Amino acid sequence: MNQLIVRQLGVQPYEEIWHQMQDFTDNRNENTADEIWLVQHPSVFTQGSAGKPEHLLNPTNIPVVQTDRGGQITYHGEGQQVMYVLIDIKRLKAQGKDVSVRDLVTALEQCVVKTLADYGIEGYPKPDAPGVYINGKKICSLGLRIRQGRSFHGLAFNVNMDLTPFRNINPCGYAGLEMTQLKDYIAESEAQCDLVSPKLVAHFYNILGYNAQQIINK
């Protein structure tokens, strides 16, 4: 059985969840089910492993955390749906699925593209700049870390949030990159993380071919 466990964690501090992801990845074994963690974070900038300090344009009272995911600096805040994917890529390959790290990135991008399509919105990835875009504006950022063939970190999908803090950085290292969110395209009553997250999970589940799912609230 290829099971996917989905944990709904609510609003949690970034560093606490980050360290829990590291512990989970370090202590899992070949029988540990893959997991998705759905969470929102209080305001925080996170700097990826390739991050350059000059991409923080204006220091603020928002904390900056140096993390171990790929990529440059980004912002997390409430109203942004974060989906962390703790996936055993080695096991998927052993099951006959040709899944590389690039394939996992593509799967994450496609689950966002398909979720946007559910709302009648055309989103698309860029081959040279991971993430998902609408008319040149970025709505979803991606960053992964692979340790011993197992992934952690994931995607951050802007749903209904204050985008102002993004003005203090070059998002994902790109000067002048404009951010957007789902609320700009649909009714605010529909642009809610608890309505969007099941769509993200369902598309990810189908793209990677899981055949069982368990949902855990906190």
Swiss-Prot record:
Molecular function via GO: lipoyl(octanoyl) transferase activity
UniProt keyword annotation of Zinc-finger present: no
Q: PROSITE patterns, alphabetically? A: BPL_LPL_CATALYTIC (PS51733), LIPB (PS01313)
Subcellular localization:
Cytoplasm
Q: In which pathway does it act?
A: Protein modification; protein lipoylation via endogenous pathway; protein N(6)-(lipoyl)lysine from octanoyl-[acyl-carrier-protein]: step 1/2
Task: Write down the position(s) of the site called Lowers pKa of active site Cys.
Answer: 138
What keywords would UniProt list here? Answer: Acyltransferase, Cytoplasm, Transferase
The protein's predominant localisation is cytoplasm
> Which InterPro entries is this protein grouped with?
aa-tRNA-synth_II/BPL/LPL, BPL_LPL_catalytic, Octanoyltransferase, Octanoyltransferase_CS
Give the EC number.
2.3.1.181
Top EC class for this record:
transferase
Example GO CC term: the record gives: cytoplasm
Please give the SUPFAM superfamilies that the UniProt record associates with this protein.
Answer: Class II aaRS and biotin synthetases (SSF55681)
Name the catalytic site residues: 172
Catalysis: reaction(s):
octanoyl-[ACP] + L-lysyl-[protein] = N(6)-octanoyl-L-lysyl-[protein] + holo-[ACP] + H(+)
Q: Which residues form the BPL/LPL catalytic domain?
A: 30-212
What other comment is given for this protein? In the reaction, the free carboxyl group of octanoic acid is attached via an amide linkage to the epsilon-amino group of a specific lysine residue of lipoyl domains of lipoate-dependent enzymes.
Q: Which family does it belong to?
A: Belongs to the LipB family.
What's the protein name?
Answer: Octanoyltransferase
Q: Which organism is it from?
A: Actinobacillus pleuropneumoniae serotype 5b (strain L20)
- Tell me the gene name: lipB
